[in-house]
From Swiss-Prot:
UniProt keywords, alphabetically: Ribonucleoprotein, Ribosomal protein, RNA-binding, rRNA-binding
Family matches, as Pfam families: Ribosomal_L9_C, Ribosomal_L9_N
Protein name in the entry: Large ribosomal subunit protein bL9
Record gene name: rplI
Source organism of the structure: Saccharopolyspora erythraea (strain ATCC 11635 / DSM 40517 / JCM 4748 / NBRC 13426 / NCIMB 8594 / NRRL 2338)
GO biological-process terms attached to the record: translation
């Protein structure tokens, strides 16, 4: 029986693939669990339409991520001020939310704090490199300058 997978099935294929399986496997496992639909001409056309829209969306997301990367590279170093002790140690640490806020104030794009990777906690003054995951294929690096608040 020819079926169209609606979800990724280990050992069989990915969502949208048209595969040939035994009738019992399709009727007793794949179809009742919603992992596949019977391959008809209408369903195949619908799958092709969905694939085209997903591909177009993937390309748009990649282009948008490239634009964000260009904006971040044009920013240069982003400056943050924080309270420090007499020994020069920060009270607390600089978080991803602090970095996102500083990037926005510096005229950069609005980022998601979950996309910022600080490589651990930033607890010292000076210049730090921070990675930003904009897309699975696009990463940018932002330079963050931490200075003492007066």
């Amino acid at each position: 029986m020819k079926i169209i997978l609606t979800a990724d099935v280990t050992g069989l294929g990915e969502s949208g693939d048209i595969v040939e399986v035994k009738d019992g496997y399709a009727r007793n496992l794949l179809l009742p669990r919603g992992l596949a639909i019977v391959a008809t001409k209408g369903a195949q056309k619908q799958v092709e339409t969905i694939r085209r829209t997903q591909e177009a969306k993937r390309v748009r997301n990649l282009e948008h991520a490239q634009e964000l990367k260009q904006q971040l590279q044009g920013l240069g170093a982003v400056t943050l001020t924080a309270k420090v002790s007499k020994q020069g140690k920060l009270f607390g640490s600089i978080t991803a939310a602090d970095i996102v806020s500083a990037v926005r104030k510096a005229g950069g794009p609005n980022l998601d704090k979950r996309s910022v990777d600080t490589r651990g906690h930033i607890k010292s003054l000076g210049k730090h490199a921070v990675d930003v995951r904009l897309h699975p294929d696009v990463k940018a690096s932002v330079s963050v300058q931490i200075s003492a608040a007066s």
